[in-house]
A protein has these predicted regions:
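The feature marks the mature, well-folded catalytic cores of soluble enzymes
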Residues: 1-179, 185-226
Length: 229
């Protein structure tokens, strides 16, 4: 501010939804169980909404260690980029131990994360190797690689086309390619181009769910955009 810079809140609306829900229910006297990964920025951001009364669980075993001050008002929220299957297992453990727990009205896991995980479940059995385009620090990209591995399909993650290693493709006839929710399309196209250089002869897109949800730009950016039209 001292240098005249402007800040814009570009937090994903799906993450903001979790923050709003936590703040609202906290005022009503609720404690929380949060399903997520310790140290993940989103988890730290959500837990940072409250001074206390929010318990992080990373797996079903952690659920048994939770000791809330009271159980009459207990709610559960999740990190938006979790593995759908892992989150479901942990949620079942939460409901088994705390049958009265309040669940989100709509699931917290990002629709783009879920769509990609559903797609990789269909893709993995059909290919010899899976390449995931995404950052090694991206939770949802790592989950895609994990899902492929559960199907016994060798899987690798690259942040850039230059990271592709030819030895990954030796003896492989069919290559599956997917990308994390925040990976820009240009990176995917660059990986495809590199695969062609390494011998790929055709590219086929599998039918999947068409994502039509669009979120508006942050308010300040919308105003700037209109000013330049």
């Amino acid at each position: 501010q001292a240098r005249g810079f402007r800040g814009f809140d570009a937090t994903c609306p799906l993450v903001t939804k979790v923050h709003v829900e936590v703040a609202k229910l906290h005022k009503e006297g609720y404690e929380f169980i949060m399903i997520g990964h310790k140290g993940h920025p989103e988890v730290e951001g959500t837990m940072g909404q409250l001074p206390s009364g929010i318990h992080l669980v990373e797996d079903a075993d952690d659920v048994q260690k939770v000791e809330p001050a009271q159980t009459q008002k207990l709610a559960v929220v999740t990190q938006t980029t979790l593995s759908v299957d892992d989150a479901a297992d942990i949620m079942n453990a939460v409901k088994q131990r705390f049958p009265q727990v309040r669940e989100p009205k709509q699931q917290d896991i990002c629709y783009a994360t879920q769509n990609r995980q559903d797609a990789i479940k269909l893709l993995s059995p059909q290919v010899d190797v899976v390449i995931v385009v995404g950052s090694p620090t991206s939770s949802n990209s790592n989950r895609l690689r994990d899902v492929a591995a559960k199907y016994g399909t060798p899987s690798y993650m690259v942040d850039h086309a230059s990271e592709l290693k030819p030895e990954w493709l030796v003896g492989k006839r069919t290559i599956g390619l997917t990308a994390g929710a925040s990976a820009p399309d240009i990176l995917v196209q660059q990986v495809i181009a590199r695969l062609r250089e390494l011998g790929a002869v055709s590219v086929r897109t599998l039918a999947g769910i068409q994502e039509t949800i669009k979120f508006p730009l942050p308010k300040g950016l919308r105003q700037i955009g209109r000013a330049h039209v």
